[in-house]
From Swiss-Prot:
Protein name: Large ribosomal subunit protein uL15
Organism: Agrobacterium fabrum (strain C58 / ATCC 33970)
Gene3D superfamilies to which the protein is assigned, alphabetical: 3.100.10.10
Signal recorded as keyword: no
One GO term describing the cellular component: cytosolic large ribosomal subunit
GO molecular function annotation: rRNA binding; structural constituent of ribosome
Compositionally skewed regions (Basic and acidic residues) per UniProt: 1-18
């Protein structure tokens, strides 16, 4: 086989249908768009318009709200931290905080702080300095002989 002998598989690509090229083509005149009306015209269709039926965004109820005072944490599991320590991305002898986790590539954005969850196992003895941790995570950290310092989340007071 040579480069000039390479061909696409039979039936792998279809020719596109050229519409509006004469009545004899079968797709001429209206070009498969029916007769007149908004949907027969050129240009982009109106977003969310479903031809007159009640659109999905009006059929479904409104739900929830955005809490402007809520805190959003970067969540990380003990297993991921242990994997980073094993891969020598995190130094177990140094304090592990948000900056260290970000530098190691364990989290992408710090947001309002880091919260540790109990997924996976922690075998290394480490010192944590984070904004929060789940109860099972705290138990696993203490069981591994590690220490954790929970930082207060900075919340701006509104007047």
């Amino acid at each position: 086989m040579k480069l000039n002998e390479i061909r696409d598989n039979e039936g792998s690509s279809k020719d596109r249908i050229r519409v509006g090229r004469g009545i004899g083509s079968g797709k001429g005149k209206t070009g498969g768009r029916g007769v007149k009306g908004q949907k027969a015209r050129s240009g982009v269709a109106i977003n969310g318009f479903e031809g007159g039926q009640m659109p999905i965004y009006r059929r479904l109820p409104k739900r929830g709200f955005n809490n402007i005072f809520g805190s959003e944490f970067a969540v990380v599991s003990l297993g991921r931290i242990q994997t980073a320590i094993d891969a020598k991305k995190l130094d177990a002898s140094a304090t592990i905080d948000a900056a260290a986790l970000k530098a190691a590539g364990v989290i992408r954005r710090v947001k309002d702080g880091v919260r540790i969850l109990a997924d996976g196992e922690l075998t290394s003895k480490v010192a944590f300095e984070v904004a929060g941790a789940s109860k099972p995570a705290l138990e696993k950290i203490e069981k591994a002989g590690s220490s954790i310092k929970l930082l207060a989340v900075a919340v701006e007071a509104s007047e």
